[in-house]
Amino acid sequence: MTSETRTLYSQLPAIDRLLHDSAFLSLRDRYGHTQVVDLLRRMLDDARDVIRNTQTLPDWYADWAQEAKLRLENAAQSALRPVINLTGTVLHTNLGRALQAQEAIEAVTQAMRAPVTLEYDLDGAGRGHRDRALATLLCRITGAEDACIVNNNAAAVLLMLAATASGKEVVVSRGELVEIGGAFRIPDVMRQAGCTLHEVGTTNRTHAKDYRQAVNENTGLLMKVHTSNYSIEGFTKTVEEAELVEIGRELDIPVVADLGSGSLVDLSQYGLPKEPMLQQLIAAGVSLVSFSGDKLLGGPQAGIIVGKKAMIAQLQSHPLKRALRADKMTLAALEATLRLYLHPEALAEKLPTLRLLTRSEASIREQAQRLQARLAARYGDEFALEVKPCLSQIGSGSLPVDRLPSAAMTFTPHDGRGSRLEALAARWRTLPVPVIGRIYDGRLWLDMRCLEDESRFMEMMLK
């Protein structure tokens, strides 16, 4: 070790001296003595590494308190940070899918602050069932006999198969053997549930006779899977649920359906693409239907199964149900969301998912044009800002081929360098509330469909 290195090491302050510095008092009050001491030890280790490797003091040596403040603030940030979603995907899986209605947020807050009647019957002063209140509500909305709630739709499909067809064959059209995000595949789920997959038909065409011919003494279910994240077009043929139910009745085999996204309203009345409705499948006689809570329904992540009382009872008594059950916060948010459907006249305003999906292209374009001048004043030296038409998507595997006309603010670098776009997008991701867009065709696009809090957005963008 050189004398110069020893001199540098000797300039490092003692932790006790730093702790008594007035600049550290507020940090100790806010973050606690233990956190601050642990951080200072790490900072001293970092400083020694810098001296050893560069023969200099660290850049932040002159202001230990400021460096400590920055590090503590960064460490205190939640792993689940709010962002401004301007990707053009409304139900963005990586960004948490459906935004919750104010009623759902308030219901969750109340459920977290006090004991609740999760599994307590006030009438009989005994144990109740956690799904009962929601089951009553779901039956009222869908026309089903009973309902069961688990933590997501993948769990719902697993439970549905394991409880009703373990050790038996499940007949599914080859064109419906879907894979969703995370390599979740229907054949894999069937194996985990103890079922044997019996494929029928071809990728593009399946007939009623294919189901009839597949049924044998070991058939447990006939299953329909809604291809919510892809579409097969052209020379195609499928068997609708109502026809499959008739086959099931004829052969005494229950019919179940995985609806995936699941919609409780006719989306076409809002000018949106039509999606199969739960009520239609229940009316057709499907024994069990599963769907997601956090997609088109607009609620929290949950798997919902509605259908025949006797088959729901099989699900409720299966050992997997306890492992997959939803917690009180999920149930509180889901109940509040479902209650919004009892007032359909106000649904498009109160349910954030539907409100965002139904925004008109004209209103989105007007919003983008209104903000353009202020953003150009901030970014115009490096980028050309334009308001351009674009197409939003619903996301989360919902209506995969359908797009929603929208408008975007685009940023094009004057020098044409793509690295400037990457740097700009990276800079926005470091904002206190990160702004997330997408880079495409030599531009950075900010689709304004999901922008509701303009003031927060402009505060971030003009920093």
Swiss-Prot record:
A single Gene Ontology CC annotation of this entry is:
cytoplasm
Sorted UniProt keywords = Cytoplasm, Protein biosynthesis, Pyridoxal phosphate, Selenium, Transferase
Kindly give the Pfam families that the UniProt entry links to this protein. Se-cys_synth_N (PF12390), SelA (PF03841)
**Catalysed conversion reaction:** L-seryl-tRNA(Sec) + selenophosphate + H(+) = L-selenocysteinyl-tRNA(Sec) + phosphate
Q: What processes does the entry annotate via GO biological process terms?
A: conversion of seryl-tRNAsec to selenocys-tRNAsec; selenocysteine incorporation
Pathway named in the protein's UniProt entry: Aminoacyl-tRNA biosynthesis; selenocysteinyl-tRNA(Sec) biosynthesis; selenocysteinyl-tRNA(Sec) from L-seryl-tRNA(Sec) (bacterial route): step 1/1
- What is the protein named? L-seryl-tRNA(Sec) selenium transferase
This chain is encoded by the gene named selA
Extract the coiled-coil ranges from the record: none
A Gene Ontology molecular function term of the record: L-seryl-tRNA(Sec) selenium transferase activity
InterPro entries for this protein: PyrdxlP-dep_Trfase, PyrdxlP-dep_Trfase_major, SelA-like, SelA_trans, SelA_trans_N_dom
Sequence positions bearing N6-(pyridoxal phosphate)lysine: K295
Quote the subcellular location field of this record.
Answer: Cytoplasm
Q: Which cofactor does it need?
A: pyridoxal 5'-phosphate
